[in-house]
Amino acid sequence: MLNVVIVGASGYAGAELVNYMHRHRFANIKKIFVSKNSLNIDKLFSDVHQQFKNIVDLRFDTIRNCTLIKKNIDAVFLATDHRVSHSLVPFFLSSNCIVFDLSASYRMNNKKVYLDYYGFVHEYEELLKNSVYGLAEWEQEKIKKANLIALPGCYATCIQLALKPLIKENVLCDKNIPIINAISGVSGAGRKASLNNSFCEVSLQPYNIFTHRHTPEIIEKLGVPVIFIPHLGPFSRGIIATITCKLKPNVKSIDIHNIFNKFYKNKPLIRIYKKYLPSIKSVEKQPFCDIGFVIKDDYIVIVAAEDNLLKGAAAQAVQCFNVRFGFSETESII
């Protein structure tokens, strides 16, 4: 039985982590933490997330006390602000914990991105070099040996899973940049209240065009330029991305289907559609990324959908945990 700690358990993604790890047959949640200024300190998890009443009744502790339990902890999940994770990761690594970081703090190879997009100077360049990017379907061999797994962003997960096979097989026209329109539910902005995410204000609207934090992540990990246009949608959870690309001549639908099948046939959390297209409804509260496509002439529109809190966050983190420790990839997830 592995002892785990979850930091940031009061947030949406953190709560999903608690749910998964509570069900995990080979893990024991030793402690759950919230920030030092949180109003939830000393409250029960089930008081904050009432759907877990009499299921998970662990008590929140302040992050200040996490230094007291560093012994006998096998793994830690960080569902925290980027700057908080930036500071906590070295501490837990020095305590011989395997770290699964859901923030962006260790995703990127280029530390300049953190100043340009996240507003802080990254102080641990060596850890950036040694972290393993936790796109579970593509990095399993590296994840098996990693001490620091940096989980991808929610948008970045959905978009990469849709595009990587086609880029890998070199079927996209080099002269045309993929154009990505993606819509996320308001839970992607976190649990903290804000006017833009309030019931009467939320709408369908684009935001942070060319400046979204996931843009450099997507470009770096795909290795090709893209135009990424994120949108906030009037629903609570889920992401749907429509990606328009130009194909090289004579690429047919059967070729694309065979490519997706080649890479994802034995990947239980990827579902490929042959006749239909994914929707938010098909992935809401599910740990899958669903992918479909339509081709006309030399153009392809790929549609990918996931739950931003699950495959875009907690489910992928637990998937990486399972891979790292040699469990079934879907243990406690499905």
Swiss-Prot record:
This enzyme's EC code(s): 1.2.1.38
SMART domains, per the entry: Semialdhyde_dh
Disulphide bridges, residue numbers: none
Gene3D superfamilies: Dihydrodipicolinate Reductase, domain 2, NAD(P)-binding Rossmann-like Domain
Enzyme class per UniProt: oxidoreductase
Pathway: Amino-acid biosynthesis; L-arginine biosynthesis; N(2)-acetyl-L-ornithine from L-glutamate: step 3/4
Catalytic residues in the record: C154
Main location: cytoplasm
Keyword terms of this UniProt record: Amino-acid biosynthesis, Arginine biosynthesis, Cytoplasm, NADP, Oxidoreductase
Coiled coil stretches, renumbered: none
Annotated GO CC locations: cytoplasm
Any one biological process term the GO annotation gives: L-arginine biosynthetic process
Known catalytic reactions: N-acetyl-L-glutamate 5-semialdehyde + phosphate + NADP(+) = N-acetyl-L-glutamyl 5-phosphate + NADPH + H(+)
Signal sequence region: none
InterPro entries listed in its UniProt record: AGPR_AS (IPR023013), AGPR_type-1 (IPR000706), NAD(P)-bd_dom_sf (IPR036291), NAGSA_dehydrogenase (IPR050085), Semialdehyde_DH_NAD-bd (IPR000534)
Stated role: Catalyzes the NADPH-dependent reduction of N-acetyl-5-glutamyl phosphate to yield N-acetyl-L-glutamate 5-semialdehyde.
Similarity-based family: Belongs to the NAGSA dehydrogenase family. Type 1 subfamily.
UniProt name for this protein: N-acetyl-gamma-glutamyl-phosphate reductase
Record organism: Buchnera aphidicola subsp. Acyrthosiphon pisum (strain APS)
Gene name as annotated: argC
